[in-house]
């Protein structure tokens, strides 16, 4: 029960409360002993809570995915077909979505834009991704396809 209560209190409030208590206690002991008050230890503070999710895992997946796209793009020049077109469309859409989502997370925060506009920008990123995927799939189905289009560009 205590751990559930501690998780309900934001980390910043717990750190602030702890540091205020330490400062008050340290001020009286420092006045008596002449020693400096204890310093905040961020490593010990991190051990006190468990994060809800890890951004590092998603970052690693994005980097591995980008590295896997390096041979995929030249392979699309040599291998034609619906499967390669679909694979390329999905890979490009996912890669662009992660890039746009990174920009939205950096610059489209509620602190910067306000709650309403920040929510609209986040929804807009998903709409942009859905339109991109729909457009690429439509191009693959009703036109020459991405692999053939790349070949036609290189023939220019």
UniProtKB/Swiss-Prot annotation:
Details of cofactor binding: The heme b is bound between the two transmembrane subunits CybS and CybL.
Subunit structure: Component of the mitochondrial electron transport chain complex II composed of four subunits: a flavoprotein (Fp), an iron-sulfur protein (Ip), and a large cytochrome b (CybL) subunit and a small cytochrome b (CybS) subunit. There are 2 developmental stage-specific forms of complex II which have the Ip and CybL subunits in common. Complex II from the free-living larvae (aerobic environment) acts as a succinate dehydrogenase and is composed of the common subunit Ip and CybL and the stage specific subunits FpL and CybSL.
Main function: Membrane-bound small subunit (CybS) of the mitochondrial electron transport chain complex II, which together with the membrane-bound large subunit (CybL), anchor the catalytic subunits to the inner mitochondria membrane. During the parasitic larvae and adult stages, which occur in an anaerobic environment, complex II acts as a fumarate reductase by transferring electrons from rhodoquinol to fumarate.
Entry GO MF terms: heme binding; metal ion binding; ubiquinone binding
Mitochondrial intermembrane topological domain residue ranges: 79-83, 142-156
The protein's name in its UniProt record: Succinate dehydrogenase [ubiquinone] cytochrome b small subunit 1, mitochondrial
Segments crossing the lipid bilayer: 60-78, 84-104, 120-141
Organism (species): Ascaris suum (Pig roundworm)
Subcellular location per the Swiss-Prot or TrEMBL entry: Mitochondrion inner membrane
Binding residues annotated for heme b, in chain numbering: 95
Binding of a rhodoquinol, residues: 107
Presence of keyword Transmembrane: yes
Mitochondrial matrix side: 26-59, 105-119
Tissues where the protein occurs: Expressed in adult muscles (at protein level).
Co-factor requirement: heme b
Lineage top rank: taxon: Eukaryota
Stretch forming the transit peptide: 1-25
Keywords from the UniProt entry: Electron transport, Heme, Iron, Membrane, Metal-binding, Mitochondrion, Mitochondrion inner membrane, Transit peptide, Transmembrane, Transmembrane helix, Transport
């Amino acid at each position: 029960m205590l751990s559930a209560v501690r998780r309900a209190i934001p980390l910043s409030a717990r750190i602030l409360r702890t540091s205020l208590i330490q400062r008050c206690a340290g001020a009286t002991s420092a006045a008596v002993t002449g020693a400096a008050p204890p310093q905040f230890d961020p490593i010990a503070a991190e051990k006190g809570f468990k994060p809800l999710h890890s951004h590092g895992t998603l970052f690693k997946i994005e980097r591995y995915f980008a590295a896997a796209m390096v041979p995929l793009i030249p392979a699309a020049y040599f291998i034609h077909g619906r499967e390669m077109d679909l694979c390329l469309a999905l890979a490009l859409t996912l890669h662009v979505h992660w890039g746009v989502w990174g920009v939205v997370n950096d610059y489209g925060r509620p602190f910067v834009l306000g709650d309403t506009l920040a929510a609209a920008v986040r929804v807009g990123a998903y709409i942009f991704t859905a339109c991109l995927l729909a457009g690429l799939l439509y191009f693959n189905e009703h036109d020459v396809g991405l692999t053939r289009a790349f070949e036609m560009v290189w023939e220019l």
